[in-house]
Amino acid sequence: MPMFQPSKNGGFDGHILDLHSAVKDGVLGGGDGKFLVVVTDEKKKLDLKEMISELELPEIPSVFICPISLEPMQDPVTLCTGQTYERSNILKWFNIGHCTCPTTMQELWDDLVTPNKTLHQLIYTWFSQKYVLMKKRSEDVQGRAIEILGTLRKAKGKAKVHALSELKQVVMAHAIAKKTVVDEGGVFVISSLLSPFTSHAVGSEAIAILVNLELDSDSKAGLMQPARVSLMVDMLNDGSIETKINCARLIGRLVEEKGFRAELVSSHSLLVGLMRLVKDRRRRNGVSPALTLLKSVSVHKQVRNLLVRIGAVPQLVDVLPCLDVECLESALFVLDSLCLESEGRIALKDSVNTIPHTVRLLMKVSEKCTNYAISILWSVCKLASEECSSLAVEVGLAAKLLLVIQSGCDPALKQRSAELLKLCSLHYSDSMFISKCKLTRTIQ
């Protein structure tokens, strides 16, 4: 938990002398002497440990923090040196043989630990105040989310768009609102707004909410209706960049569902829209969600064939140098999947950048990338051995393969590299191939 930095004048120097003064001086709040008085029934007394675990506070007064664990104290005790620690932590310190104060390193002339009741009360009061305020805000947020859902159920036209926009803001700002929307049947209400006649204004707001909610299997099944997927595809092509990203992410979550049907994503419009996101050089935030969805759908044969037909192979190959590690792994996975189809292998062979771009990635990014790249190179070199192997060797493949073989990579990857190296050597004399394998001209 983050620790509040003490003030330059030393704060309390580790001592709490008077609870009333501490409250008055603003330790419990904003320094104006005002604070929330927490009154609890003894039977319903708030548990300090529970409050600390539930509250995610960016700042906590340093006087509440145990110097050993750097966590808020629940049972503070003070040593003869005047330093205060969490009881369990200081007892562990003593049990391992230490007889000094952890902070000052002074020899202890007395190992007695004295409960610091004043500090404990101050800690309890401070956390209680924060906890009660958090609960009150949560109730306010829940009430607001329920109110907006009620409005949404009967709203029409611009009022519907306004209600969705308000709900989106609440959902994105408060985790409790997401749960409230789900618990109150909001997923069904919002999903029912998606139809062939839905305007993009309504659809984009609805999808922005849905993509931020926890969806169960029934909710996903409802969203997998062809008309709703079709609307998402339309907005992926024609919406704003934020809407396109949300559509890609939401469809990606549906694809993972057990009952998902491949024909729902075997769509020319969907794949073209995703490739537009991948190629968009001005707005790169859409690349990762697009490639992630392409990776998920490329396991289906009909999708692979359609990807080849829309010209995805050279487009994906050409963007490889611009991608980060995560995106590279997804793009190479897709290209490797396309090698399963004869048309895909031909398209990879015919793309002028396939060999130089994939060779350049070997041993440079990650083992996954190296694995996919070698698999792609194997497919194209096997298809046109003399033409592709010679080109690959000329751009440094042989030396890179030797590095893979000598590395600590997976044995199966090293075996595939050895087989590819052997395939490349068939079109050279021994002396010529050995010269091509020299490491001096590789690995920038």
Swiss-Prot record:
Domain U-box, first and last residues per copy: 59-133
Alphabetically list the UniProt keywords.
Repeat, Transferase, Ubl conjugation pathway
Q: What is the lineage of its organism?
A: Eukaryota, Viridiplantae, Streptophyta, Embryophyta, Tracheophyta
GO MF terms held by the record? ubiquitin protein ligase activity
Repeats (ARM): which ranges? 301-340, 343-382
Q: Which gene encodes it?
A: PUB31
State its Enzyme Commission number(s).
2.3.2.27
Q: Which Gene3D superfamilies match?
A: Leucine-rich Repeat Variant, Zinc/RING finger domain, C3HC4 (zinc finger)
A Pfam family reported for this protein in Swiss-Prot or TrEMBL: U-box
Q: What class of enzyme is it?
A: transferase
Indicate the segments annotated as coiled coil, or none if absent. none
Organism field: Arabidopsis thaliana
Give a short account of what the protein does: Functions as an E3 ubiquitin ligase.
* Catalytic activity from the UniProt record: S-ubiquitinyl-[E2 ubiquitin-conjugating enzyme]-L-cysteine + [acceptor protein]-L-lysine = [E2 ubiquitin-conjugating enzyme]-L-cysteine + N(6)-ubiquitinyl-[acceptor protein]-L-lysine
Protein's UniProt name: U-box domain-containing protein 31
Cited InterPro entries:
ARM-like (IPR011989), ARM-type_fold (IPR016024), PUB22/23/24-like (IPR045185), RING-Ubox_PUB (IPR045210), Ubox_domain (IPR003613), Znf_RING/FYVE/PHD (IPR013083)
Q: In which pathway does it act?
A: Protein modification; protein ubiquitination
Q: Biological process GO terms, please?
A: protein ubiquitination
